[in-house]
Structures are given as C-alpha cells and as structure tokens.
Amino acid sequence: MKKEELQQNMKDRMQQFEDGGLRLLKKGQKGIVHAIFSRFGLVLLLMLLQVGVLWSVFRWFGELLPHYFGGSVAMSAFMVVYILNSEMDNSAKITWMVTIAILPVVGVPLFFYVKSNIGHNALKKRVTRLTEEARGLQPQPLVAAQELAEADLGAASLARYLHGKGGGFSVYRNTEVTYFPSGEAKFEELLRQLEKAEKYIFLEYFIIDEGLMWGRILEVLARKAAEGVDVRVMYDGTCEFTTLPRDYPSRLEKLGIQCRVFSPVQPFVSTHYNYRDHRKILVIDGKVGFTGGVNLADEYINHIEKYGRWKDAAVMLEGEAVRPLTILFLEMWSILREPEFEKFLSVPPHSVPAEGFAAPYGDCPLDGERVGEMVYIDLLNRAKRYIHIMTPYLILDGELETALKFAAERGVDVHLILPHVPDKKFAYALAKTHYKSLLDSGVKISEWLPGFVHAKVFVVDDSEAVVGTINLDYRSLYHHFENAVWMKDTTCIPAIEKDFQKTLEFCRDVEPTRESIWEGKVLLHLAGILLKVIAPLL
C-alpha cells in the first residue's frame, strides 16, 4: 500500500480520543451485552454444548457398567498407581487422584484427554523446530561468559543453564538496563523510543485494549507504518473474548500494520487453548527492547481504576541483550509461516557500553522444561542476605514452596509483596492458603493496601534481579509462554530494591495467625481450602 493511501486510511478509519491517540472501534462496542451477542457468545455456547454432550456420554457409559461400583474402584486403584509413578508435580498428583477417586467415570477420561495433548501436537512440533533453529542464532559471547565466571561462579552456573537446557539463551554485556517502577513511567519512555524507529517495530502482548494507552501507541505505529517502517503486532487469542473483535487484525492491516493472533479461541473443546501467550515484548530496530508486567491497556497506567491503584514494573534494554527479545518475537510470529530470522538478525547486535550482565529468556510450556521456575528456585537457593519478591499471585507447587521456606530457614530475608485488592477472588483465596506455612518458616509476607500488585520482580543481595512476565502460579510456571530478563550487577538493580522498599511503605504485614491472614473472611477461607485441592488445574 502506498504512503498516501496509508495516511488517508489513518484519517478515514480512526476517531480521535479527547486526550489524544487513535481509536479503531466505536464507543459502545464492549461490555457484557455486546459480548453475549458477539462471537464470544457463540463460541461459549458451542463449547457448553460440547461439554454437555461429553457429560451425557460419560453418564451413559457409567450406566452401562454391569458392576459399576466394583469397576470404578478397580479403575481408581489402577489410575492412582499410574499417577503416583508419573513425573507430575506432587500437588498435581494429589489433584488428579482426588478427582478420579470421587468421579472415576469422568476423571479417568478427562485425565487421559488432558495428558494426551490432543489439539496441540502440531503446535508443539512447530515450536520445537523454531526453538532449535533459534538456538544457533544466540552463540554465547565468550568474553561475557568468562567475565561472569570470574565475578560469580553461582551466577555463571545459572547462565550455563539458560544457554543449555534452559533454551539456548545467552548472557550479554554491553547492555544498558532501565527499570520502570510503574506502567506510567514505562509508557512515557516507550512513546519516546517509538518515535525513533527507522526499520521495524515488533509488539507481542497478552492484552491489548483500546483506550488512551493503546490509542497513543497506535497513532505512532500507524504513522511509522506510513513512513515505511515494518510494524508488526501480535496478541493472545483471549483478547477476542475480552477486549478486541475478531476482525481487528484486518483493521490494523489497512493501516499498514501487520497483525497476528496467537491461538484464536475456536468453538471446540481442546487442550490447545490451555497454552496462552503471556509474553510482553516490544523491540525497536533491534536496538531497544521492553518487557515486564505491563500490558497495553489503560488500567496498567492508572488512567482507569479497576482494582484500586495498579502497581506494575518493566525494564528497557538498550544494547546487545535486545537480540534474544527479537528472537523470541520472531519465534512466535513464525509459528504459522516461514521464519524470518536471517532478515532481522544478520547484522551484529547493537552495543551500548554498560556495567553488568543481562540475559533475556523465554519459557515454553511445550518442551517440559520449567525455565521460569528453575531460575526462581536457583535465586532462592543462592541468596545469602535477602531475596525480595513482588508477585500478583501465590499458587505454589511443592518445589517452589520448599525453596522459599528453605531460604528463610537458612537465615535469608525472604519477603513477598502481594496485592491486598485482588483481581481474581479465587487466586486471592488460594494465595492465603500458603501464608501460614511460609510465615511459620520465617518468610515475610506483606499486602499492598492501595490496590493490585501486578509486578513480577525478584531482587537478590543488591546484585541480581529478574523482571518479566512470570507469576508465581501454575498457569505461568506450567502452561503459558512467558519471558523475563535476568540481570547481574546492572546499574538498575539498586533502583529495583528501592522500589521494593518504597512499595513496602504502603503495605500491611501479615502475621502467622488466622485473624491476620483471613481478616475474618470465613467464606474466603472456606473457598481457599476447597480450591487448593484443584489448584494445579486452575
């Protein structure tokens, strides 16, 4: 499309927000009523019908068993032995054993359906091939590896894991890392950097929603596309259920912006939909990259209020370590097309003199390697003085809970900040079920009173930190595509710890008593107890 046509499309197809930015949707194209009578309503209805049919089949099958009770007991016993000998997390084993023991005719087929991975085998093969191809594009810079080993053998061992079994991610020097303690701070710098784009802009986000934030960004993207910049946008398919219409990619493409939707939700029951793209990546010309917890919607910059004040965090990378973010984006972009690695990675990485080391990495739920969790556990095991954590959720498996408790029992100051105002009541209830055990081991827990904490931050001993998208829950650690940046001795680490301490000023400290943990909320307490049985399935 010619430059003049793109500019005309900008004028014809967009409406200005009162406070700037651009809009592709008319006001009123959201809300429950719109959702019910949209594709969302149709997909939900068809899925419910399929679930109803499956339930009827299971009940019919149960009625056909001549000796139902004896058969169900034998079936349950066999499955318990099978699950006990599987490689699942212990919490997941308990969940499945309870489900099968109570509802064997439903639980057994459900277990095999979920574990057979029907619906995403093709995706797994494609992602595996792309990941292997990308490994060769990230050779470990020898100087960086040697200098890291000389500085800290423990940190060097983590770098070896990331470059080996962790997915082929290298550790880089010559990268300036800037920390943003809020979505507002990231947004301001992001707009400034977008204006500098000359070759390409890549965006991959879990949530995009029309409003001030996305409108301001979209205005720049459309203008840059008209100038000849290669602009690509990718978002998760759940946006079609919650924020954007199905035809939104075509609306963007009329502005010269390429757009793809990861795993659009179709009206078929499938385990494929369990794997969501929770990453948040923005890359500009291979020189500047952003990541962290901030999605592209107004609540993330406190332009609107959903759950009180919104607390988030992000980082900007300038230099060599932007390369892995470019690769992660191109991997996801290429799932349904031929990869374009060489087109964007043929030139040497952009270098910016800076202190410390940075290693952006991704986590894929289809390769059996829980990279995000392994990095967190390694930091907990190597911490000497303190490890300070901000996370929106706390739904732990046995390994991570043990690592948190063991670090505290070694005398490390383990301190977690969680939200006092939750976005999901069930997640809030589940988090509180872990409080007593952690507190009794010496872990400190504080809840941020002004609202919702969405930041995913680890900072350790004034020397290491992780900022990214990876929550402390089963969905992030087991089922989502995620990403983060591990840092060692970068100049921004003091700013991360300073932000933790400043956030702590507006928190309430939780004591290891029922009154302090549950605050007299009996129903919430009961919900937490019941939900914990099925936590790995949530």
Residue ranges and their predicted role:
Residues 312, 390-391:
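A short, conserved beta-strand element enriched in hydrophobic/aromatic residues
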Residues 381, 402-405, 432-436:
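Internal, well-ordered alpha-helical scaffold/interface segments
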